[in-house]
Design a protein with these regions (language model features):
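Glycine/small-residue-rich phosphate/adenosyl-binding loop
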Residues: 40-43, 64-81
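Short cysteine clusters
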Residues: 94-97
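Short beta-strand scaffold segments in enzyme catalytic cores
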Residues: 29-34, 258-267
């Protein structure tokens, strides 16, 4: 089994994964998972984009490594506990990945800084982007090793001390520069792929399609309840309650807290109803399942299709920013809640449209409105400025009462 017994060697592996990601046409980020002896357990790169299409907005390196860890454990593979595992990433974790790392209890060693979306975007190890209750854990487990040199890529060590199995605890300046430049070379072009969908006025109602249409059949395979509920756009009502309640029961059966999320389209049609898979992975929340399922539904319909067929898919299954995610439970200030907020940002990847300011809705609050607004305002610039993440409670009192009962 390959080993990386100094930080530089581990970051070099992550940088090679980042180069592979760039070659694939996705965000140039990579990561590697090590045990407490420095043995390489797994190495992956970002997989948000495949074949020029959005494949999975949650497929960042760190998130993939964590789900891989839990999947291997579920298969019976003997792996060390998370606190003995170290994830080495070529780029500062985003909010989704930081939440996933903290939820699992892993250690992390970070190469390049990310001033826009990184959890340490301020660069001082204060982690003010995190909810206050998570900051101390981050300071104890997130390491930003020294980069020796005189260029803008040099830095002093910040955060936790890298795990003791690392003999060398610094990053070479050229490797740090490579990690930064590979990401910078891909960020704009990849983000642009999230804007390939038509505007709201060009969308078509999938509820008008015949049952045998390939889009309807694919929807029904993914979610048998698709197109069986409809409300005024952006105004979920009490009719949605049974769908959320059913998903919440299934979530509890899977070891979750009663998590449930539905995706409504721009016309108010129910497209997906999802629960978490926490018995399989500590980070497979209902929202992570929902946003991934929708992206992969669209990807499978568009992969290998003609441009005209791809356009049809995008017209009937628009970008989520034109629809509404409805959570049974609002975001909390725990690691999973922060991960969900981050994953929402990774799904949007751009500003919410002016016609749909209430894209992110929840039925029952986990935090009071002021505290939730404060949590969102503390997030890195991508989330609070560019995307404008702002969850809000549904307006329908009967829906709230039904889920509270």
């Amino acid at each position: 089994m390959k080993k990386a017994i100094d930080v530089q060697a581990a970051v070099a592996i992550a940088s090679l994964e980042a180069i592979a990601a760039k070659t694939q046409g996705t965000f140039g980020v990579g990561g590697v998972m090590l045990d407490s002896f420095g043995s390489v357990l797994q190495a992956v790169h970002n997989n948000v984009i495949r074949n020029g299409l959005v494949y999975d907005p949650t497929a960042h390196g760190e998130r993939q490594l964590i789900d891989w860890y839990y999947a291997q454990s579920a298969k019976g593979r003997a792996l060390p506990p998370p606190h003995e595992i170290t994830i080495v990433t070529s780029l500062d974790p985003c909010c989704m990945c930081a939440g996933a790392i903290l939820a699992g209890g892993f250690n992390v060693v970070v190469a390049a800084n990310d001033r826009q979306a990184g959890v340490n975007h301020e660069g001082d190890g204060s982690f003010t982007a995190l909810p206050e209750g998570l900051r101390e854990q981050a300071r104890a487990t997130f390491a930003y090793p020294a980069v020796l040199g005189s260029s803008s890529y040099a830095r002093t060590a910040i955060g936790a001390t890298p795990p003791p199995f690392f003999i060398g605890k610094t990053i070479a300046e050229p490797t740090q520069a490579l990690c930064s430049l590979v990401f910078e070379a891909t960020a704009e072009s990849v983000t642009g792929l999230f804007d390939a969908d038509p505007p709201r006025e060009q969308l078509r109602d999938p509820g008008t399609l015949p049952p045998e249409h390939p889009i309807v059949r694919a929807l029904k395979r993914t979610c048998p309840d698709a197109l069986t509920y409809r409300c005024t756009p952006q105004r979920p009502d009490a009719g949605l309650a049974p769908y959320l309640q059913h998903a919440a029961r299934r979530d509890r059966a899977q070891g979750g807290p009663g998590d449930a999320v539905v995706l409504l389209d721009a016309f108010g049609n129910l497209l997906l109803r999802c629960h978490g898979q926490r018995s399989q992975s500590a980070i497979r929340t209902a929202f992570m399942e929902c946003t991934r399922a929708y992206a992969q539904l669209r990807y499978k319909l568009m992969e290998g299709a003609t441009p005209a067929q791809q356009d049809e898919v995008r017209q009937y299954l628009g970008h989520p920013r034109d629809g509404t995610f409805v959570f049974a439970q609002g975001p909390g200030d725990d690691a999973a809640g922060f991960m969900n907020l981050g994953a929402y940002g990774s799904t949007m990847e751009g500003p919410l449209p002016a016609h749909n300011p209430a894209q992110f809705q929840y039925v029952l609050p986990a935090l009071d409105e002021a505290r939730l607004a404060e949590l969102c305002a503390d997030m890195p610039p991508l989330y609070r400025q560019r995307i404008g993440t702002r969850p809000m409670q549904v307006r329908d009192a009967a829906l709230v009462a039904a889920l509270r009962a």
